[in-house]
UniProtKB/Swiss-Prot annotation:
Keywords: Cell membrane, Membrane, Transmembrane, Transmembrane helix. This is Uncharacterized membrane protein MJ1375. It comes from the Archaea. The chain crosses the membrane at residues 20-40, 43-63, 78-98, 109-129, 155-175, 243-263, 300-320, 328-348, 360-380, 388-408. GO terms for cellular component: plasma membrane. It comes from Methanocaldococcus jannaschii (strain ATCC 43067 / DSM 2661 / JAL-1 / JCM 10045 / NBRC 100440). InterPro entries: Poly_Biosynth_Transport (IPR050833), Polysacc_synth (IPR002797). The keyword Transmembrane helix applies.
Length: 415
């Protein structure tokens, strides 16, 4: 199956998932109000970052190892799932202490919200594992179905749970959706392998956990560390502005900024549609022409979206959130450009990981994260939420340029 066809499958699921994600946030914005929605937006990047770091960083490593195997034996990957669960429990325990690092308005939030965030980390393990296997098998059609099921469940659950449990209910709906998607993902693995996936071994905790720290598992874990650090840093990088705004300015302005930030992130559905199948294919072929093909596809997919955000920013703001705050409009224009540069870096990062240079990708995004934190702390204090968007734009351009330089240097060695 070609990269283009794989990308179309992922794009279609991402279009659906992004649409459902907008519906998820629309429902929470409608039910919670701007300030409570701002608190949710301030917690979501924390939940996502911890989920990636303690759980979802391993699946790309699984995909790489699996894609390089001549004879596939899925059952030997089962102990990895238990290792992921163990790491996620550590993340759950550490979550309540995050507020002391974030400070500001985060200190005023009840602990139950932080426990809800921790629950998201634990619940994500099964769906993350199944996606790693499906990606490694190059079953992109099945992989795309896991997103569809997850987001469908999330939207169904969020309305009821948010209505009765508020912000806690919104976070709980995410955990339950992870579980539903994870169980469905295991079924898809069984279907893809035509019954060769041993469910008995999956639930045989006693024997499976004996191999949890095998050399094979540790090799995957070691490879996943820079990927997990890169991905979690990348996620934190993308929303450090919202976190700083929440900490310094509180829930209301975090909500206003969150509206614009959420819409601008729509560009990433195009980039992820290309980057997900790009990693295992470059890992197999070491062909950088695939990166060029991916960049062209991303440009075609993203151009209309960016133009719309630049010239008609008030339309999506009013359509989705019934508000068009002047600061929010300006932020959306700036963030659309920023997201375009970061979408290109998403492809560059996947190429670096596929070529075995995951550490370089991590160093680049770590530099970007530190720069973004510094700029946000300065500019948010000086210019409010507009300062947050300017800080993100400056950092995005810097990260993109460094990524291009790294790829050009590596290309010389390959040639």
């Amino acid at each position: 199956m070609s990269l283009c066809k794989d990308s179309i499958y992922i794009l279609m699921s991402n279009l659906y998932s992004k649409g459902m994600a907008y519906l998820f946030y629309f429902i929470t914005a409608f039910l919670l109000g701007t300030e409570a929605f701002g608190i949710l937006k301030g917690l979501m990047p924390i939940a996502d970052t911890l989920t990636i770091f303690f759980s979802s960083g391993i699946p790309p490593a699984i995909a790489k190892f699996l894609a390089e195997e001549k004879e596939v034996d899925i059952n030997k990957y089962i102990p990895i799932l238990y290792l992921m669960i163990l790491l996620s429990v550590v993340g759950f325990i550490l979550t309540p202490y995050i507020k002391y690092i974030l400070g500001g308005h985060y200190l005023n939030l009840p602990n139950i919200l932080y426990f809800a965030v921790g629950l998201c980390v634990v619940a994500s393990t099964v769906i993350a594992f199944s996606r790693g296997i499906l990606q490694g098998l190059l079953k992109m059609k099945y992989l795309s179905l896991t997103w569809i099921v997850e987001y469908t469940a999330k939207v169904i659950l969020v309305f009821i749970l948010t209505l009765y449990l508020g912000i806690f209910g919104s976070l709980l709906s995410i955990s339950l959706a992870y579980l539903v998607g994870g169980i469905f993902g295991l079924y898809l693995i069984y279907k893809a392998l035509k019954g060769k996936f041993d469910f008995k071994k999956l639930i045989d905790i006693k024997n499976t956990t004996k191999n949890i720290f095998s050399n094979f598992n540790l090799d995957i874990l070691r490879y996943s560390i820079p990927i997990a650090l890169t991905s979690s840093s990348y996620r934190l990088f993308g929303d450090i502005d919202n976190i700083v705004i929440m900490s310094i300015m509180g829930g209301f302005w975090s909500g206003i900024y969150g509206y614009s930030s959420l819409i601008s992130r729509g560009i990433f559905m195009f980039a992820s549609a290309v980057s997900i199948p790009l990693l295992p294919r470059i890992s197999k072929t070491k062909d950088l022409s695939l990166l060029k093909e991916g960049i062209i596809q991303n440009t075609i997919f993203s151009s209309i979206f960016v133009i719309g955000c630049l010239f008609f920013p008030e339309i999506p703001l009013i359509a989705f959130f019934k508000t068009a705050n002047p600061e929010g409009i300006l932020c959306l224009r700036i963030l659309a450009i920023s997201s375009l540069f970061m979408s290109y870096y998403t492809l560059i990062s996947s190429a670096l990981q596929g070529l075995g240079y995951a550490k370089i990708s991590f160093y680049i995004i770590l530099f970007g994260l530190v720069l973004n934190i510094i700029l946000n702390l300065i500019l948010v204090n000086a210019y409010g939420i507009v300062g947050g968007s300017l800080a993100t734009l400056i950092t995005s351009i810097s990260v993109f340029l460094i990524g291009v330089f790294a790829i050009l240097r590596i290309k010389k060695h390959i040639i």
